[in-house]
Amino acid sequence: MSLVDTVKNAFVPIHREGYPFIAACGAGTLFLGYFSSVLFWLGLILTAWCVYFFRDPERVTPVDDRLVVSPADGIISAVGPAVPPRELGLGNVEMTRISVFMNVFSCHVNRSPVRGRIAKIEHRPGKFLNAELDKASTENERNGLVIESPNGTVAAVQIAGLVARRIVCWAEAGGSIGTGERFGLIRFGSRVDVFLPLTATPRVAVGQTAVGGETVLAEFGGVAGTPLVRIS
């Protein structure tokens, strides 16, 4: 590895969505620093946190159509059957839902859980309840992607939370997307639900830490069974 590559790998990329926030924090820090050194250091800490929040690291995604990867960094908050949001047009039939909760320290860039064609993108206004609540999946503001994958229809739903009130999605309906490919971002704490056909076997447990684009959430063609339980 060259010296240039070593230096490059030492710095985590920052997503462009964070540039305005980082610039505002930096400018505010300089302004406050003119009046108080204490305020300057507090502003510097806030700016550093903002840089950390909008980090966009590269991820190593397993290349296998049977695998479903996590759409976000966070904690697995739910694994089990659930009816997908009505606006996705997937009917009133239960699918396997795996929820990933992101706190304010998580990387908030969202990635596709599978590869395929984006059949539909639907944004729905709503409330801003705590994203950890189960009813947040149907009552909160959200943005859903319906993906026609090689193993059936899969949906990824970005859900706003108490603090996160800005959902960003740059994917387009009708286009194709790869497993682990970036498609959006949610600012300042939120959740992403993945809805899968019941033929998919969950490979994670509630409470487990997930890494977006890398952690395998479920597998198609695996041995049938109930969702994993956490064993301490």
Curated annotation (Swiss-Prot):
Residues forming the catalytic site: 190 (schiff-base intermediate with substrate)
Main location: membrane
Record-linked PANTHER family: ARCHAETIDYLSERINE DECARBOXYLASE PROENZYME-RELATED
Reactions listed under catalytic activity: a 1,2-diacyl-sn-glycero-3-phospho-L-serine + H(+) = a 1,2-diacyl-sn-glycero-3-phosphoethanolamine + CO2
EC category: lyase
EC number: 4.1.1.65
Keyword terms, alphabetized: Cell membrane, Decarboxylase, Lipid biosynthesis, Lipid metabolism, Lyase, Membrane, Phospholipid biosynthesis, Phospholipid metabolism, Pyruvate, Zymogen
GO MF annotation terms: phosphatidylserine decarboxylase activity
Keyword Transport in record: no
Gene Ontology terms: biological process: phosphatidylethanolamine biosynthetic process
Site annotation Cleavage (non-hydrolytic): residues: 189-190
Pathway annotation from the record: Phospholipid metabolism; phosphatidylethanolamine biosynthesis; phosphatidylethanolamine from CDP-diacylglycerol: step 2/2
Description of post-translational modifications: Is synthesized initially as an inactive proenzyme. Formation of the active enzyme involves a self-maturation process in which the active site pyruvoyl group is generated from an internal serine residue via an autocatalytic post-translational modification. Two non-identical subunits are generated from the proenzyme in this reaction, and the pyruvate is formed at the N-terminus of the alpha chain, which is derived from the carboxyl end of the proenzyme.
A Pfam family per the record: PS_Dcarbxylase
Free-text cofactor note: Binds 1 pyruvoyl group covalently per subunit.
UniProt function note: Catalyzes the formation of phosphatidylethanolamine (PtdEtn) from phosphatidylserine (PtdSer).
Organism: Mesorhizobium japonicum (strain LMG 29417 / CECT 9101 / MAFF 303099)
Modified residues (Pyruvic acid (Ser)): 190
GO terms under cellular component: plasma membrane
Name listed for the protein in its UniProt record: Phosphatidylserine decarboxylase proenzyme
Membrane topology, as annotated: Peripheral membrane protein
Record text on subunit structure and interactions: Heterodimer of a large membrane-associated beta subunit and a small pyruvoyl-containing alpha subunit.
InterPro entries, A to Z: PS_Dcarbxylase, PSD-A
Places the protein is found: Cell membrane
Name of the gene: psd
